[in-house]
Amino acid sequence: MTQRLSKLYFEQISPKLIEKFSYKNMHQVPRVEKIVINRGVGEAAQSNKVLESSLKELNLISGQKGIITRSKKAIAGFKIREKVPVGVFVTLRGDRMYSFLDRLINLALPRIRDFQGISAQSFDKYGNYSLGLEEQLMFPEIEYDKIDQLRGMDISIVTNARNSEEGLALLKEFGLPFKS
């Protein structure tokens, strides 16, 4: 099953970027490699229930099983011992990646209260984009009655663009609503 955004990339976005940046080869055109959704859950060190609910929510949002991250070393100030669960993440590629990106652009971001667009300043020098969301309720898969606490997440869109200008052009063509 090919995703709408995947088809859009090959039929419309790729030719536009070839024309804009005058690439000589189709393989030079930047593309989205993967999307990583990360959620730090520091309270998981004290309560396993928090970690399980966070993992379940991430599974619902992404459509894929998440991975538990563990602390590398003990930090007394944060009351964390070594190898204690401190977060969850999931890496999306292929059709699931395009499906998530489509839902993020068309369903989740417009549901943010007083949404003005996302900042174009969050690109690194390699054309990857990072976005922080403050709550999980913007995703239609999450029901308000079934969450125990509002928790945010970090979303990293990894591209193979050579610089931030190419990455911005790619994500604008996909329809990400950047502030003007």
Swiss-Prot record:
Gene Ontology MF, one: rRNA binding
Any one Gene Ontology BP term: translation
Keyword line: Chloroplast, Plastid, Ribonucleoprotein, Ribosomal protein, RNA-binding, rRNA-binding
SUPFAM superfamilies (UniProt xref): RL5-like
Primary subcellular site in the record, as a coarse category: plastid
One GO CC annotation: ribonucleoprotein complex
Cellular localization per UniProt: Plastid, Chloroplast
UniProt keyword annotation of Chloroplast present: yes
InterPro entries linked: Ribosomal_uL5, Ribosomal_uL5_bac-type, Ribosomal_uL5_C, Ribosomal_uL5_CS, Ribosomal_uL5_dom_sf, Ribosomal_uL5_N
Quaternary structure, from the entry: Part of the 50S ribosomal subunit; contacts the 5S rRNA.
NCBIfam families noted in UniProt: PRK00010.1
Protein function: Binds 5S rRNA, forms part of the central protuberance of the 50S subunit.
Family: Belongs to the universal ribosomal protein uL5 family.
Protein name (database record): Large ribosomal subunit protein uL5c
Organism: Stigeoclonium helveticum (Green alga)
